[in-house]
UniProtKB/Swiss-Prot annotation:
The lineage of its organism: Bacteria, Bacillati, Bacillota, Bacilli, Lactobacillales. A motif ('KMSKS' region) lies at residues 520-524. Belongs to the class-I aminoacyl-tRNA synthetase family. ValS type 1 subfamily. ValRS has two distinct active sites: one for aminoacylation and one for editing. The misactivated threonine is translocated from the active site to the editing site. Signal peptide: none annotated. One of its GO terms (molecular function) is aminoacyl-tRNA deacylase activity. It comes from the Bacteria. InterPro entries: aa-tRNA-synth_I_CS (IPR001412), aa-tRNA-synth_Ia (IPR002300), Anticodon_Ia_Val (IPR033705), M/V/L/I-tRNA-synth_anticd-bd (IPR013155), Rossmann-like_a/b/a_fold (IPR014729), tRNA-bd_arm (IPR010978), tRNAsynth_Ia_anticodon-bd (IPR009080), Val-tRNA_synth_C_sf (IPR037118). It catalyses: tRNA(Val) + L-valine + ATP = L-valyl-tRNA(Val) + AMP + diphosphate. This is Valine--tRNA ligase. Residues 809-844 form a coiled coil.
Length: 883
């Protein structure tokens, strides 16, 4: 057991060294119990590009909550950690660092550059693991993986070769998205489209015979040197007679043909379209149909090449200005029309993406997508939480394009294809035998390897690997909605293809972390928050509590320091009530407490408040477990918060002082037992969310680690509706008196007469039997409880279920003000009656709702009507006083 709890909650003291202790105790490893049901999660591998942000903290907190609860519930749990090499992002970071030293990757060469990247990886992997520790993540480091590990690399090569041999991976020259900053191809989903201010540049292309000019328009005039034709619609009467003739390409005076193609829309612009097959996907298709040449006028860094004539070597955007100026000087510029249009930008480097003709490797997606779609029509489909994201997944799969998987980078999985001087190509998991072969210099898209993450980390392609057999498919994936297509969909179709099984049973989708104003956190806005700074100020438990309670599945969460203050205050409350309970524990053990609690629920010992709190605890266990199972951590947190702060701390702990400050030692032992038992159950319920503080408090009274303690379960013997109903009525009475005092500014310390009128004999007996609690909380000079109480002439009155409460206030009350208060109360009951009446008059509701739900509404109606009638009566009495 640990040392005594400090007088003040200090998260730094509580959390210091605790994580290392857990690691030393090996409590995060699978139990190895073959009789237990396995439950596995693979961590979405963070990029080794830098520190983790709040989004990572949220993502991993949710996973840790799940795995810690399942571990406590007796599952054989595995949470497998790892990191992603993040090809383009990491290479860009390392190149940026080298540029600061005046070095480029080309100065170093591939091998030495990769040495630098591995150094970067080691540096930031250590940083990430340190952050995981501060967050308290219960991962099994003995199984840590990296996407460039040899085992994972072997899986990548096998998948590539198998897909190639099936004809589902092919190499070809097509228009792709090109990042001129990173000098690599990008897939469609790595391109972010933004609305930007631009212009349509209208130009005249003169017919070769000089008889007339055709007007064309483009937003990218710098690509005109790659024009190989102009197209008109074959049905466009304006140009039918021109088909087959030539126009002269301005500046370089090159003749190009006029072709007939339906790509040209007679209703749009002039109906004449310039065709640049090497720089536009639609033009590429036109070029294929008409067997047109492909003229690439741009270098891979976004500068113009020698085919751009005098603009050779200029940046594409500088060339745009210069070309327009030249066209104007030649008389070919007709007009410039400002416009706002959508322009693709690289997700990683932020630069404008260039459509560019390039030889790349592609995955043919037709059948892979069909397999994924078909799987979602089975009973064993992947369940999305919330379910609406299944529609998002299906929509993407139904509209998927072939996936460009090659990247012109050095950091990553080098494509397992080799070429020789004879123009032959060899694709295989290992290099071909013999000399004269050169491996393809490109690497695979990072998502190609991370798509294999759930099964490659478990030992696949060795299907006899122990972890693969035991923990695959995994149980739950937690991730953000922004990478459903990037990652989730690809894991699903790759897993179905190569293992015959889906990679996980559930996908929990969370949103994005936003600032207090609802803005996405970003470097450009300067509103990003380092989770380590938050932990330093508030502790990891407070951050985890906020992150788990911030929103529902699929929703964004707004970060605020006000919410962090509230989180810290809640933990401080738990700390203080724990200190109170443990300071009054008198050496009671948890086993002794359990034995005594069993007697309490069997009504052998204890009082009604003991049975009430145990009943409510049992209900809380059921509701929290139910919501955990649905990944509704926010709902579960609200239930826990209400039980701990309101029912346990504010009511039960205060009620126990009546016993603990008495001389009855037998009753004290029972009260201490209920307090300790309830605290223990609370800590176990909280542990998945707040691992550090619960471990610290648990260590005061129990042996071992709470990490491996059993999770609370619903116990039918704890149910006691009589105790629940009675104490809730008692609370209503006390609250009513307190509220009445407050309304007329009568201090709690001032004794006052309290009259409780009830015709319910059971309630009357209950109030009398427990009048000690009423007196303790309301400070009456006189307390009368009876059905025969005469209504006082002038009194504060209130109505609770089954009783009326009067506080005679002849010397303290303004009658007119009391009458106004009652009118307000009457309006409140009328509003409640209108609402419930509207619901019960809805035939559809009555017909479709569960009978118990309808009955609950009817009970509400009866209760509200009783309160309404009693309030009417009091108003009439008060009016008599006024008269």
């Amino acid at each position: 057991m640990s040392k005594e709890l400090s007088p003040k909650y200090n998260p730094a003291e509580v959390e210091e060294g605790r994580y290392q202790t857990w690691l030393d105790q090996d409590v995060f490893k699978p139990s190895g119990d073959t009789e237990a049901k396995p439950y596995s999660i693979v961590i979405p591998p963070p990029n080794v590009t830098g520190k983790l942000h709040l989004g990572h903290a949220w993502d991993t907190t949710l996973q840790d909550i799940i795995i810690r609860q399942k571990r406590m519930q007796g599952f054989d749990t595995l949470w497998l950690p790892g990191m992603d090499h993040a090809g383009i992002a990491t290479q860009a970071k390392v190149e940026e660092r080298l540029r600061e030293q005046g070095i480029s990757r080309y100065d170093l060469g591939r091998e030495k550059f990769l040495d630098k990247v591995w150094e970067w990886k080691d540096e930031y992997a250590a940083t990430i693991k340190s952050q995981w520790g501060k967050m308290g993540l219960s991962v099994d480091y003995s199984r840590e993986r990296f996407t460039l590990d040899e085992g994972l690399s072997k899986a990548v090569r096998k998948v590539f070769v198998d897909l190639y041999n099936k004809g589902w991976i092919y190499r070809g020259e097509f228009i792709i998205n090109w990042d001129p900053a990173a000098r690599t191809a990008l897939s469609d989903i790595e391109v972010i489209h933004k609305d930007v201010e631009g212009a349509f540049y209208h130009m005249n292309y003169m017919l070769e015979d000089g008889s007339r000019a055709l007007e064309v328009a483009t937003t990218r005039p710098e690509t005109m040197f790659g024009d190989v034709a102009v197209a008109v619609n074959p049905e466009d009467a304006r140009y039918k007679d021109l088909i087959g003739q030539n126009v002269i390409l301005p500046i370089i005076n090159k003749p190009i043909p006029i072709v007939a193609d339906e790509h040209a829309d007679p209703e749009f612009g002039t109906g004449v379209v310039k065709i640049t097959p090497a720089h536009d996907p639609n033009d590429f298709a036109v070029g294929q149909r008409h067997n047109l040449p492909q003229v690439n006028v741009m270098n891979d860094d976004g500068t113009m090449n020698e085919l751009a004539d005098e603009f050779n070597g200029m940046d594409r955007f500088e060339a745009r200005k210069a070309v327009v100026a030249k066209l104007e000087s030649l008389g070919n510029l007709v007009k410039i029309k400002k416009t706002t249009h959508s322009v693709g930008h690289s997700e990683r480097t932020g630069v404008v993406v260039e459509p560019r003709l390039s030889t790349q490797w592609f995955v043919k997606m037709d059948q892979l997508a069909k397999n994924a779609i078909a799987n979602q029509d089975t009973e064993d489909k992947v369940e999305f939480y919330p379910p609406r994201f299944n529609d998002t997944f299906m929509s993407w799969m139904e509209n998927v394009h072939d996936w460009v998987i090659s990247r012109q980078l050095w950091w990553g999985h080098q494509i397992p294809a080799w070429y020789n001087v004879n123009g032959e190509m060899y694709v295989g998991e290992d290099a071909p035998e013999g000399d004269g072969w050169t491996q393809d210099e490109d690497v695979l898209d990072t998502w190609f390897s991370s798509a294999l993450w759930p099964f490659s980390t478990m030992g696949w392609p060795d299907t006899e690997a122990a972890d693969f057999k035991r923990y695959f498919p995994t149980s739950t994936l937690v991730t953000g909605y922004d990478i459903i297509f990037f990652w989730v969909s690809r894991m699903i179709f790759q897993s179905l293809e190569f293992t015959g099984r889906q990679p996980f049973s559930n996908v929990l989708i969370h949103g994005l972390i936003r600032d207090e104003e609802g803005r996405k956190m970003s470097k450009s806005l300067g509103n990003g928050i380092d989770p380590m700074d938050v932990i330093e100020k508030y502790g990891a438990d407070a951050l985890r509590w906020f992150l788990s309670n911030g929103s529902a599945p699929g929703q964004d969460v707004r970060f605020s320091y006000e919410k962090m203050d509230a989180s810290w205050n809640f933990i401080n409350k738990i700390w203080n009530i724990s200190r109170y309970i443990l300071m009054n524990n008198e050496g009671l053990t948890l086993d002794q407490a359990r034995e005594n609690v069993e007697k309490v629920v069997n009504s052998q010992v204890g009082n009604v408040t003991d049975r009430w709190i145990l009943h409510n605890l049992n209900e809380t266990v059921g509701k929290v477990t139910e919501n955990f199972d649905k990944f509704e951590f926010g709902v579960a947190g609200h239930i826990l918060y209400n039980f701990i702060w309101e029912e346990f701390a504010n009511w039960y702990v205060e009620l126990t002082k009546e016993v603990l400050y008495s001389d009855n030692e037998d009753e004290k032992v029972i009260t201490r037992s209920v307090l300790l038992y309830t605290l223990d159950q609370i800590l176990r319920l909280l542990h998945p969310i707040m691992p550090f503080v619960t471990e610290e408090i648990f260590g005061q009274y129990a042996e071992g680690s709470i990490v491996l303690a059993s999770y609370p379960q619903v116990n039918a013997t704890f149910e006691n509706q009589t105790a629940h109903k009675g104490v809730e009525s008692l609370k209503d009475l006390i609250r009513s008196v307190r509220n009445s005092r407050a309304e007329v500014n009568v201090a709690p310390s001032k004794p006052i007469t309290i009259l409780v009128k009830t015709s319910d004999s059971e309630l009357e007996s209950f109030f009398k039997d427990n009048s000690n609690y009423i007196k303790r909380f309301t400070n009456p000079e006189t307390l009368e409880i009876s059905s025969a109480i005469a209504t006082p002439e002038l009194a504060m009155s209130s109505v609770i279920t089954g009783a009326e409460i009067f506080l005679p206030l002849a010397d303290l009350l303004n009658v007119e003000e009391e009458l106004a208060r009652l009118e307000k109360e009457l309006a409140k009951w009328q509003k409640e009656l209108d609402m419930v009446g509207k619901k019960l008059s809805n035939e559809r509701f009555v017909a479709n709702a569960k009978p118990e739900v309808v009955q609950k509404e009817k009970d509400k109606q009866t209760d509200y009507q009783t309160k309404y009638d009693a309030t009417i009566a009091r108003i009439e009495e008060m009016k008599k006083l006024v008269r």
